[in-house]
């Protein structure tokens, strides 16, 4: 299983726009083949810091997910939303 943790730092004035863009992606991604879970969390310690935690069956499922039009749209909008660069960690879940 492959795990992705993506941390997003969002400008205060872009918070509502970010959430409007990411919310439909959550449902869409969860319906994709190979998606075990796909959730967005907001930090309790830092306003407008969000962490997307994704669990995928394998790299092929991630590659297919990366073609999701809603994800592509979010990628295009992130420079406008971001207060600073996102941090993305991809890991393989061991036995």
Regions found by a protein language model. Name each.
Residues 14-35:
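Short amphipathic alpha-helical segments
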Residues 22, 66, 75-78:
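Short, flexible helix/strand-to-coil boundary loops that buttress conserved ligand/catalytic motifs
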Residues 40-48, 76-95:
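Glycine-rich beta-strand-turn "strand-cap" elements at beta-sheet edges
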Residues 1-2, 95:
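Absolute protein N-terminus
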Residues 13-16, 47, 65-69, 73:
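Residues at secondary-structure transition points
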Residues 2-8, 39-66:
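Short, well-ordered beta-strand segments in beta-rich or mixed alpha/beta enzyme
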